[in-house]
């Protein structure tokens, strides 16, 4: 069966949560523009069930992820904390939970290269599947910049239903 046939058999909607990882955002010192953009765009495809801004702290990121999952999210998108500074801990927090890692990061970096050139080596955007006993959740981790989020959303919106179909098999 080809990609188009798989997409026809894919779910038609999903529930999603958004987590913004930002020290300044969590303190109210910086407006979160990326989280609301994700909510706006994914609301065209699914139901928004969770949103939270957390500091760059592993425990806070994990608590928010588990809250999003408990809220019924089939898909969780994080934004922020994917760079290479000491405070960028989103990937280290979430990636160990993945049962399967997707090639999202490679595609994201290829698309980003078209926009920012070699600076794309600074991103560690990733995605993966977390399998529970009764539920499966797809997690995408995007950089915090609005332009990077737009790039990530282009990929997510194109493949999220296809990913959900296969993840649930």
UniProtKB/Swiss-Prot annotation:
Its EC number is: 2.7.7.75
Record-linked PROSITE patterns? MOCF_BIOSYNTHESIS_1
Q: Which GO terms describe its biological process?
A: Mo-molybdopterin cofactor biosynthetic process
Q: What's an example of a GO molecular-function annotation for this chain?
A: molybdopterin adenylyltransferase activity
Q: Which GO terms describe its cellular component?
A: cytosol
Among Pfam families, the record links this protein to: MoCF_biosynth
Thermal characteristics: Optimum temperature is >80 degrees Celsius.
User: Do the record's keywords include Transferase?
Assistant: yes
The entry's keywords: ATP-binding, Molybdenum cofactor biosynthesis, Nucleotide-binding, Transferase
Which reactions fall under this protein's catalytic activity?
molybdopterin + ATP + H(+) = adenylyl-molybdopterin + diphosphate
- InterPro entries listed in its UniProt record: MoaB (IPR012245), MoaB/Mog-like_dom_sf (IPR036425), MoaB/Mog_dom (IPR001453), MoCF_biosynth_CS (IPR008284)
Which cysteines form disulfides? none
Q: Does the keyword ATP-binding apply?
A: yes
**Subunit relationships:** Homohexamer.
What this protein is reported to do is described as:
Catalyzes the adenylation of molybdopterin as part of the biosynthesis of the molybdenum-cofactor.
Q: Which family does it belong to?
A: Belongs to the MoaB/Mog family.
Spell out the protein name for this chain: Molybdopterin adenylyltransferase
């Amino acid at each position: 069966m080809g990609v188009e046939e798989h997409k026809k058999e894919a779910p038609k909607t999903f529930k999603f949560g958004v987590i913004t990882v930002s020290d300044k955002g969590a303190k109210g010192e910086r407006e979160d523009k990326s989280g609301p953009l994700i909510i706006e765009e994914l609301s065209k495809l699914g139901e928004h069930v969770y949103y939270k801004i957390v500091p760059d702290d592993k425990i806070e990121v994990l608590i928010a992820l588990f809250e999003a999952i408990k809220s019924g999210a089939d898909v969780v998108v994080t934004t922020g904390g994917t760079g290479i500074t000491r405070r960028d801990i989103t990937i280290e927090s979430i990636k160990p939970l993945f049962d399967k890692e997707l090639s999202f990061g490679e595609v994201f970096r290829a698309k980003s290269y078209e926009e920012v050139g070699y600076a794309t080596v600074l991103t560690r955007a990733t995605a993966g599947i977390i399998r529970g006993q009764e539920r499966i959740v797809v997690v995408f981790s995007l950089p915090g910049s609005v332009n990077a989020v737009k790039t990530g959303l282009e990929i997510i919106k194109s493949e999220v239903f296809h990913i959900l179909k296969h993840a649930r098999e």
